[in-house]
Amino acid sequence: MPVSNLTLVERIARVLAGRAHSINAEGDDPSAGPNVDETWHEYVDDALSILRTMREPDPVMAAAGDPDVWERMVEAALNVEKAVGNA
């Protein structure tokens, strides 16, 4: 399985920033990458809220794998952010 060099919170925040800036979503920038690089930090609180919501798997997710592992993985992602001061 590939492993990202970015934290999960940063990846979520970058997606949210991209949606706000990119012409392919809600924004008007045809080349939003630089804006995303500059502004993704503004979306960290939203990303944390999304991740907190995902702590508990739904029934389909629980049936597909180990719910305890899922919860530990999400908590680990949140704890990384606490360690760097974002949570």
Annotated model-derived regions:
Residues 2-35, 49-70, 84-87:
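Amphipathic alpha-helical oligomerization segments
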Residues 36, 43-46:
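Extracellular ligand-binding/catalytic regions of CAZymes and related secreted enzymes
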Residues 39-42, 64-72, 76:
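Cystatin/cathelin-like cysteine-protease inhibitor module
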Residues 46-49, 76:
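A generic structural signal for solvent-exposed, polar alpha-helical segments
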Residues 77-83:
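Structured N-terminal alpha/beta-domain signature
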